[in-house]
From Swiss-Prot:
Disulfide bond sites: none
Similarity comment: Belongs to the universal ribosomal protein uS10 family.
Gene: rps10
Organism: Pyrococcus furiosus (strain ATCC 43587 / DSM 3638 / JCM 8422 / Vc1)
Protein's name in the database: Small ribosomal subunit protein uS10
GO cellular component, as recorded: small ribosomal subunit
Amino acid sequence: MQKARIKIASTNVRSLDEVANQIKQIAERTGVRMSGPIPLPTKRIRITTRKSPDGEGSATFDRWELRVHKRLIDIEADERAMRQIMRIRVPEDVTIEIELIS
């Protein structure tokens, strides 16, 4: 049977876990086998910029950081379950990638 590999990524952990829990509930209701959500390593993007716009004065810097959290879910590709997953309301800061594997 085919499997669907669902990759979820977001900068907000709460909304990410909320979407993962919705997928988990759909899997339990439809009775398909599921593994996950597996937390993947958090990607940390760091940017250091100079505070002074003209280069004069003391060298002071701002440090900015963006964290991208990811989860991986493997689920059986049952038609009924996949249709319900496609209907989930996804927040703007969450991206979902669904890949069918055999």
